[in-house]
UniProtKB/Swiss-Prot annotation:
It comes from Edwardsiella ictaluri (strain 93-146). Belongs to the bacterial ribosomal protein bL19 family. One of its GO terms (molecular function) is structural constituent of ribosome. This is Large ribosomal subunit protein bL19. Signal peptide: none annotated.
Length: 115
C-alpha cells in the first residue's frame, strides 16, 4: 500500500523546480482565475521558509507591497504554479527568516551570495 502511494506521489511531482534556498529572491508565476478568464500573476519576493515534504513541499515568499508586508505560502508541486524563477541569491545563516517580519527598509536587506 505504501509503495503505491509513493509511486502516485512521484508521478505528480514537478521535475522542473529550480534549486533555491531561504534568502533568495524569486518570482513565482501563478495561474489566477477571474470569472471565466485565466491569467498569469507574478509574485516576487524573498523566500523566508522552505518545507521539504516530498509532494507536500511548500515555501513562503515575503514582499513589501505599498508599505505593507505580504507573505504567501506556495505548494511547490501545485498545478497552480506556472514557473519559479530565481532572481537573486541571498547569503543567510538561518533556514527560517522570520526575523525579517520585524525589520523594515534597509534593515531587511539581505547580502548577495557570490557563489
Amino acid at each position: 500500500m505504501n509503495n503505491i502511494i509513493k509511486q502516485i506521489e512521484q508521478e505528480q511531482m514537478k521535475q522542473d523546480v529550480p534549486a533555491f534556498r531561504p534568502g533568495d529572491s524569486v518570482e513565482v508565476k501563478v495561474w489566477v482565475v477571474e470569472g471565466s478568464k485565466k491569467r498569469l500573476q507574478a509574485f516576487e519576493g524573498v523566500v523566508i521558509a522552505i518545507r521539504n515534504r516530498g509532494l507536500h513541499s511548500a515555501f513562503t515568499v515575503r514582499k513589501i507591497s505599498n508599505g505593507e508586508g505580504v507573505e504567501r505560502v506556495f505548494q511547490t508541486h501545485s498545478p497552480v504554479i506556472d514557473s519559479i524563477a530565481v532572481k537573486r541569491r541571498g547569503a543567510v545563516r538561518k533556514a527560517k527568516l522570520y526575523y525579517l517580519r520585524e525589520r523594515t527598509g534597509k534593515a531587511a536587506r539581505i547580502k548577495e551570495r557570490l557563489n
